[in-house]
């Protein structure tokens, strides 16, 4: 099979358009997007440093793409060209380049079959959970305890000059263990905010009014026009270490649900690790239920 390796951020418009066609076709076929947000950004941002391997058919038409970032990759094949070995070819290639985790969004039958054929094992599961209807309205009810107030980022700038530094502090306390979300600095935060969907009014902070410090935050996301039926998302929620074990985690979630429901969201989704049983129980109690599963497959470790 023929393949070209490039960065699509600097590739020709024709190649980028062809990849966009493949992504759209796969989304229609599978019911979920084949690439995550970070890998979608990597298609357009050269500074992200992603490498793209494009496999071609006998007529030199690109029919599949593997996006690679460090030891992680995501692979998509045009539905019209599946079950012809292109996906397996791309996965073998990225694994040969040091990739240890290949994402399968939706984890459909095709992905399971390829993983089995290549003797890859599931190493991580990321669930999408959703709440809608009456349960959303119920869980969006908000009572802020005495001594705290809720401010959106655009409001917080006026009363808390170092709000961004406090945001980073709480984020890094909350996600010290997390490979992607932890250890952020100002540049990483600026990069995360550099998206078309970012709104300062959608980042909510729980403020300890006596200390004028951030106790926690809830960064929400809109997947389009909420009034037109687009999903809202519990994007990132973080609680500072000094405020743990005080029952504030539930409040932080409700802050975002309250905001999104007020903004006319009909459904709110979130992502949670499949093995995080305590978080899943908390989300179950708020009416969330599993709607999608995303997994990573990895080469079997030798023992």
UniProtKB/Swiss-Prot annotation:
Which PROSITE patterns does the protein's record reference? GNAT
Write one Gene Ontology MF term: protein-N-terminal-alanine acetyltransferase activity
Residues that, per the record, bind 1D-myo-inositol 2-(L-cysteinylamino)-2-deoxy-alpha-D-glucopyranoside: 37, 180, 221, 233, 271
Its recorded reaction(s) are: 1D-myo-inositol 2-(L-cysteinylamino)-2-deoxy-alpha-D-glucopyranoside + acetyl-CoA = mycothiol + CoA + H(+)
Q: Where is the N-acetyltransferase domain?
A: 6-134, 154-303
Q: Where does acetyl-CoA 2 bind?
A: 237-239, 244-250, 276-281
| A Pfam short name | Acetyltransf_7
Positions the record marks as coiled coil are: none
E.C. designation(s): 2.3.1.189
Q: Which family does it belong to?
A: Belongs to the acetyltransferase family. MshD subfamily.
Q: What is the name of the protein in this document?
A: Mycothiol acetyltransferase
